[in-house]
Protein backbone atom coordinates (compact mmCIF):
# COMPACT_ATOMS: atom_id res chain seq x y z
CA UNK A 1 0.00 0.00 0.00
CA UNK A 2 1.11 3.53 -0.74
CA UNK A 3 1.90 5.99 2.05
CA UNK A 4 4.40 8.82 2.55
CA UNK A 5 7.79 7.90 4.04
CA UNK A 6 7.59 10.88 6.40
CA UNK A 7 5.38 13.93 6.82
CA UNK A 8 5.84 17.26 8.50
CA UNK A 9 2.76 16.79 10.69
CA UNK A 10 1.02 13.60 11.84
CA UNK A 11 -2.57 14.87 11.56
CA UNK A 12 -4.40 17.07 9.05
CA UNK A 13 -7.66 18.96 8.80
CA UNK A 14 -10.29 17.28 6.65
CA UNK A 15 -10.68 20.21 4.26
CA UNK A 16 -13.37 20.37 1.60
CA UNK A 17 -13.65 19.26 -2.01
CA UNK A 18 -14.51 22.33 -4.08
CA UNK A 19 -14.23 22.85 -7.82
CA UNK A 20 -12.56 20.80 -10.53
CA UNK A 21 -9.01 19.51 -10.87
CA UNK A 22 -6.70 22.05 -12.48
CA UNK A 23 -3.60 19.84 -12.29
CA UNK A 24 -3.19 16.22 -13.32
CA UNK A 25 -6.18 16.35 -15.66
CA UNK A 26 -4.38 15.58 -18.94
CA UNK A 27 -2.82 12.36 -20.21
CA UNK A 28 0.97 12.64 -19.86
CA UNK A 29 2.55 9.19 -20.10
CA UNK A 30 0.30 6.58 -21.71
CA UNK A 31 -2.35 6.53 -24.40
CA UNK A 32 -5.41 5.49 -22.36
CA UNK A 33 -6.50 6.77 -18.95
CA UNK A 34 -9.12 6.60 -16.21
CA UNK A 35 -10.51 10.03 -15.32
CA UNK A 36 -12.69 10.92 -12.33
CA UNK A 37 -16.10 12.57 -12.66
CA UNK A 38 -16.80 13.15 -8.95
CA UNK A 39 -14.87 14.49 -5.94
CA UNK A 40 -13.78 11.93 -3.34
CA UNK A 41 -11.13 10.60 -1.01
CA UNK A 42 -9.55 7.49 -2.51
CA UNK A 43 -7.77 5.25 0.00
CA UNK A 44 -4.40 3.63 -0.60
CA UNK A 45 -6.14 0.23 -0.52
CA UNK A 46 -8.49 1.25 -3.35
CA UNK A 47 -5.57 2.59 -5.41
CA UNK A 48 -3.68 -0.67 -4.92
CA UNK A 49 -6.75 -2.81 -5.74
CA UNK A 50 -7.24 -0.92 -9.00
CA UNK A 51 -3.55 -1.20 -9.91
CA UNK A 52 -3.52 -4.95 -9.23
CA UNK A 53 -6.68 -5.51 -11.26
CA UNK A 54 -5.13 -3.68 -14.23
CA UNK A 55 -1.78 -5.50 -14.08
CA UNK A 56 -3.51 -8.89 -13.85
CA UNK A 57 -5.63 -8.06 -16.88
CA UNK A 58 -2.82 -6.69 -19.06
CA UNK A 59 -0.39 -9.48 -18.09
CA UNK A 60 2.98 -9.09 -19.87
CA UNK A 61 2.37 -6.27 -22.35
CA UNK A 62 1.88 -2.61 -21.65
CA UNK A 63 2.85 -0.19 -18.94
CA UNK A 64 0.70 1.29 -16.17
CA UNK A 65 1.18 4.64 -14.44
CA UNK A 66 -0.55 5.51 -11.15
CA UNK A 67 -1.08 9.27 -11.22
CA UNK A 68 -2.36 9.80 -7.66
CA UNK A 69 -0.65 9.38 -4.30
CA UNK A 70 -2.30 9.11 -0.87
CA UNK A 71 -0.70 11.90 1.14
CA UNK A 72 -3.53 12.80 3.55
CA UNK A 73 -3.78 10.93 6.89
CA UNK A 74 -7.28 10.06 8.09
CA UNK A 75 -7.73 9.75 11.84
CA UNK A 76 -10.20 7.41 13.51
CA UNK A 77 -11.27 7.37 17.14
CA UNK A 78 -11.52 4.00 18.91
CA UNK A 79 -15.01 2.48 19.20
CA UNK A 80 -17.08 3.38 22.27
CA UNK A 81 -14.87 6.30 23.28
CA UNK A 82 -16.26 9.34 25.07
CA UNK A 83 -16.16 12.73 23.40
CA UNK A 84 -13.17 14.97 24.00
CA UNK A 85 -9.59 13.98 24.80
CA UNK A 86 -8.21 15.08 21.44
CA UNK A 87 -8.22 13.87 17.89
CA UNK A 88 -7.98 10.17 17.01
CA UNK A 89 -4.84 8.46 15.77
CA UNK A 90 -3.98 8.24 12.04
CA UNK A 91 -5.49 5.05 10.66
CA UNK A 92 -5.04 5.13 6.86
CA UNK A 93 -4.00 7.39 3.98
CA UNK A 94 -6.15 8.94 1.25
CA UNK A 95 -5.60 10.80 -2.01
CA UNK A 96 -7.86 13.84 -2.39
CA UNK A 97 -9.36 13.65 -5.89
CA UNK A 98 -11.45 16.27 -7.69
CA UNK A 99 -13.45 15.85 -10.92
CA UNK A 100 -11.20 15.66 -13.99
CA UNK A 101 -8.21 14.10 -12.22
CA UNK A 102 -6.44 11.22 -14.00
CA UNK A 103 -6.11 8.16 -11.74
CA UNK A 104 -4.34 5.64 -13.97
CA UNK A 105 -2.70 5.72 -17.38
CA UNK A 106 -1.87 2.84 -19.66
CA UNK A 107 0.14 2.40 -22.83
CA UNK A 108 1.59 -0.27 -25.12
CA UNK A 109 -1.61 -2.33 -25.41
CA UNK A 110 -4.50 -2.44 -27.92
CA UNK A 111 -7.56 -0.32 -27.10
CA UNK A 112 -9.91 -3.24 -26.38
CA UNK A 113 -7.52 -4.70 -23.76
CA UNK A 114 -6.94 -1.26 -22.20
CA UNK A 115 -10.69 -0.57 -22.09
CA UNK A 116 -11.35 -3.91 -20.36
CA UNK A 117 -8.52 -3.49 -17.81
CA UNK A 118 -9.47 0.10 -17.00
CA UNK A 119 -13.16 -0.80 -16.60
CA UNK A 120 -12.18 -3.47 -14.03
CA UNK A 121 -10.06 -0.88 -12.16
CA UNK A 122 -12.97 1.59 -12.37
CA UNK A 123 -15.26 -0.90 -10.63
CA UNK A 124 -12.87 -0.85 -7.64
CA UNK A 125 -13.24 2.93 -7.28
CA UNK A 126 -15.91 4.51 -5.03
CA UNK A 127 -16.79 7.15 -7.66
CA UNK A 128 -17.96 7.60 -11.25
CA UNK A 129 -15.11 7.58 -13.76
CA UNK A 130 -14.61 7.64 -17.51
CA UNK A 131 -12.21 6.02 -19.99
CA UNK A 132 -10.32 8.54 -22.12
CA UNK A 133 -7.90 8.28 -25.05
CA UNK A 134 -5.16 10.84 -25.77
CA UNK A 135 -5.39 12.63 -29.09
Swiss-Prot record:
InterPro entries: Ribosomal_uL16, Ribosomal_uL16_bact-type, Ribosomal_uL16_CS, Ribosomal_uL16_dom, Ribosomal_uL16_sf. Keywords: Chloroplast, Plastid, Ribonucleoprotein, Ribosomal protein. Pfam families: Ribosomal_L16. GO terms for molecular function: mRNA binding; rRNA binding; structural constituent of ribosome. The keyword Ribonucleoprotein applies. The keyword Chloroplast applies. PROSITE patterns: RIBOSOMAL_L16_1 (PS00586), RIBOSOMAL_L16_2 (PS00701). It comes from the Eukaryota. GO terms for biological process: translation. Its main location: plastid. One of its GO terms (cellular component) is chloroplast. It is found in: Plastid, Chloroplast. NCBIfam families: rplP_bact. Belongs to the universal ribosomal protein uL16 family. Part of the 50S ribosomal subunit. This is Large ribosomal subunit protein uL16c. It comes from Arabidopsis thaliana.
Amino acid sequence: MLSPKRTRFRKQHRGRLKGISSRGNRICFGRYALQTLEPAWITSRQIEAGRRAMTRNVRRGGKIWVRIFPDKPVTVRPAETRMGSGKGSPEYWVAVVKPGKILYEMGGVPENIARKAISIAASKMPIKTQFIISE
